[in-house]
């Protein structure tokens, strides 16, 4: 069985912030967001190459229900590294900048 994807601290912070925002909109919606994010991240262990490269070595798995969000990740020595969960309206340079800082 493939190893579970590793969630870096900035990605965990993104997930928590988005879940809190959704929970402020409607009680329980944050938990639904967390469930979908977890399912998407877990699916990356089985098929990490299924998503297209967005830039450099970074791939993005879009959420289905919470469409503006994507799970951004890269592969490093065969391991899936999740470094961010971003809303589509965020400037791409922020995503690129975070990936650059992690190199």
Region annotations inferred by a language model:
Residues 1-34, 103:
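Arg/Lys-rich, positively charged N-terminal/basic patches that mediate binding to nucleic acids
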Residues 31, 52-54, 94:
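Short, hydrophobic secondary-structure boundary micro-motifs
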Residues 18, 47, 95-98:
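Residue-level signal for well-ordered alpha-helical positions
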């Amino acid at each position: 069985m493939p190893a579970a994807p590793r969630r870096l601290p900035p990605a965990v912070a993104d997930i928590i912030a988005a879940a809190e925002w959704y929970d402020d909109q409607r009680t329980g919606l944050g938990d639904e967001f967390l469930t979908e994010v977890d399912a998407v991240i877990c699916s990356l262990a089985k098929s990490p190459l299924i998503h297209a490269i967005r830039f450099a070595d970074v791939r993005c798995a879009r959420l289905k229900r919470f469409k503006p969000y994507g799970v951004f990740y890269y592969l490093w020595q065969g391991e899936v590294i999740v470094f961010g969960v971003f809303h589509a309206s965020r400037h791409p340079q922020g995503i690129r900048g975070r990936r650059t800082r992690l190199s």
